[in-house]
Amino acid sequence: MPIRHCIVHLIEKKPDGSPAVLHARDSELAESQALENLLVDLNDSYNAKQGKAWGLFQEESGAYPFSGWLGAYLEGARDFAAFSRQAVEHLKTLMEESNLSSGGHVLFAHYQQGMTEYLAIALLHHSEGVTVTETLEVAPAKHLDLAQLHLAARINLSEWRNNRQSKQYISFIKGKNGKKVSDYFRDFIGCREGVDAPGETRTLLKAFSDFVESEDLAEEEAREKTSALVDYASTQARLGAPIALEELSGLIDEERPRAFYEHIRNKDYGLSPEIPPDKRTLNQFRRFTGRAEGLSISFEAHLLGSRVEYDEEHDTLTIRQVPSQLKDQLKRRKDGQ
């Protein structure tokens, strides 16, 4: 991962309304293996976080100046250290206005993955641990705790600069359970949600279910295509990358690589060519299958509790909204009697 620029500042702040103290670094961090390892681990931790939101910058204003500063840096009007210093001073001000906020090390990293450039911003915290010294003594030691990554954002700079119509070039970690602790960080970036990742993922899965039903696939083939979808989407989520519908379509059916893509377009599900995956929604999309004595049943796990009800006590399975093709067969059989 080529690292263009990276710097770390420190904001000391307690969540009690007390003033924040900024310790700003004057120069960028030098390239090193330790720095590269840190960014790789940070990326992995960030990609693994559930509950991220995807969006875009607010209109630049006095309340949301960050995008203007970032644009000036990218155009060469100021260097990376000066840009980060201006940004972290703004973050410090917002921290002081939020009684819920606490300080930490603020990392800014401009790096490249493949052909895409990113800016990552994260508030890092330490955890207490222990180490064994060179003299074989046990001593306390601090380390960056990336498992406790709660405030971070990643901006796809290439997407922002080349596709101003995009509504998903920023991803950021949302607060859990309605907590407002992350609001000041979102205001610092100056971003708003542009894409509902869980909703988009649910729509994709609905489109896939409709596709499988319309194709009247055999049980084994339906299971294979479901696995192909879930495996690809889960991999994209792990990489922090979007689901590309045309690429997914080719993986689902190699002989007819555009069949699923054309199904989505013809039925007008309203999906963008690329959508952000939601891991929690994907985890619910597995198939239950069973076969015995001339009976074969297969359905997606997310339907359990809605269209499919299982009564363990009476050993019964109730199916609502019977598939249209099965319904037609049953009606023809009934009419023929």
From Swiss-Prot:
The record's listing under InterPro entries reads:
Nucleoid_associated_NdpA
Name of the protein this chain belongs to = Nucleoid-associated protein Avin_11450
- Cellular component annotations (GO), alphabetically ordered: bacterial nucleoid; cytoplasm
Q: Which family does it belong to?
A: Belongs to the YejK family.
Organism of this sequence: Azotobacter vinelandii (strain DJ / ATCC BAA-1303)
The UniProt entry lists the main location of this chain as: cytoplasm
Superkingdom is Bacteria
Q: Tell where it localizes.
A: Cytoplasm, Nucleoid
- The set of disulfide-linked cysteines is none
| UniProt keyword list | Cytoplasm
Name the PANTHER family for this protein: NUCLEOID-ASSOCIATED PROTEIN YEJK (PTHR38772:SF1), PTHR38772
Identify the Pfam families for this entry. NA37
Mind listing the GO molecular function terms for this protein?
Answer: double-stranded DNA binding; single-stranded RNA binding
